[in-house]
């Protein structure tokens, strides 16, 4: 089957930048209001996702803040080198990505794997981070779940049926996941080296240094957001992340693993309230 490489248009300019020798695609939202507001927010997607996964919350957030949203190396439409993906590799990539774009201070919103990356980055760069927002971050979970297993199956065998099944199980209310999200994932996982990058990243998270005892290094205000019915990374795994000093956990009712897709209005309201404090 042919791969549809059409990039969804969500009214944000697509940009390319070279980082560590790799071409990295990113979206950039900015306007006159956000130019006066010096706060930059960088959004980091989960494993197997892309910058476009955030499209449901960007129009509202971009009214107040400049947004930078990369396709993390190995994902989306960025380069997918056949290297060993480790958390150190991703942290170095993110540090150099920010340097290349001239971002010296930022707030970060990270989902799942992107939340884990944001956490690792912040532990070593707290002086650069104003606020940290983590939506069901990975890193604490060491045992797979049935929902994660289905997602892995969809990544390795990206048929429409497998992909739809995985996303319906990931969300609490299956109909909250748009068809575009399902087809975009399916198409991207058929791109060269996409499966390799996915599995190498999965192993990187599994083999990473544990978080316990290290989270106290984070000294920036932190918001944890979890879906009440998250079957991918269940709510129980939030306990380890609450070791972050000055952290707050907010539960979104009737929601699964992707609150910014399932409950974008509630997610945005929660985020904006936290950022404005």
Walk through the language-model features, giving the residues of each.
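Flexible "cap/lid" loop of the alpha/beta hydrolase fold
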Residues: 119-123, 130-160
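Gly/Ala-rich beta-loop-alpha elbow adjacent to hydrolase catalytic centers
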Residues: 110, 114, 118
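Acidic catalytic loop of the alpha/beta-hydrolase fold
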Residues: 228-233
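Conserved HGGG/HGGXW glycine-rich cap/lid loop of the alpha/beta-hydrolase fold
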Residues: 22-77
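Conserved alpha/beta-hydrolase catalytic His-Asp/Glu region
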Residues: 24, 143, 160-217
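Catalytic active-site module of serine/aspartate enzymes centered on a nucleophile-bearing elbow/loop
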Residues: 247-277
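Active-site loop/oxyanion-hole signature of alpha/beta-hydrolase fold enzymes
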Residues: 27-33, 56, 69-110, 269
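Short beta-strand/loop motif that positions the catalytic acidic residue
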Residues: 218, 224-226
């Amino acid at each position: 089957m042919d791969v549809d490489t059409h990039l969804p248009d969500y009214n944000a300019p697509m940009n390319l930048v070279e980082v560590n020798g790799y071409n990295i695609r990113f979206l950039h939202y900015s306007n006159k209001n956000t130019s006066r507001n010096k706060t930059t927010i960088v959004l980091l997607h989960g494993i197997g996702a892309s910058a476009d996964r955030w499209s449901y919350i960007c129009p509202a957030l971009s009214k107040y803040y400049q947004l930078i949203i990369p396709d993390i190396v190995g994902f989306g439409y960025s380069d997918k080198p056949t290297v060993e993906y480790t958390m150190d590799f991703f942290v170095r990539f993110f540090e150099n990505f920010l340097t290349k774009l001239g971002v010296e201070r930022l707030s970060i919103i990270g989902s799942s794997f992107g939340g884990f990356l944001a956490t690792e980055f912040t532990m070593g760069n707290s002086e650069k981070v104003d606020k940290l927002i983590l939506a069901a971050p990975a890193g604490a979970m060491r045992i797979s779940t049935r929902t994660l297993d289905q997602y892995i199956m969809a990544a390795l065998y990206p048929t429409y049926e497998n992909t739809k099944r995985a996303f319906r199980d990931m969300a609490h209310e299956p109909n909250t996941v748009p068809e575009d999200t399902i087809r975009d994932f399916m198409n991207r996982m058929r791109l060269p080296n996409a499966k390799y990058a996915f599995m190498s990243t999965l192993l990187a998270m599994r083999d990473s240094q544990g978080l316990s005892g290290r989270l106290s290094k984070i000294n920036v205000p932190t918001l944890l957001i979890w879906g009440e019915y998250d079957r991918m990374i269940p709510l129980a795994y939030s306990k380890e992340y609450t070791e972050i000093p000055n952290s707050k956990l907010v539960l979104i009712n009737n929601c699964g693993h992707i609150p910014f897709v399932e409950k974008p209005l509630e997610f945005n309201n929660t985020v904006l309230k936290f950022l404005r404090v």
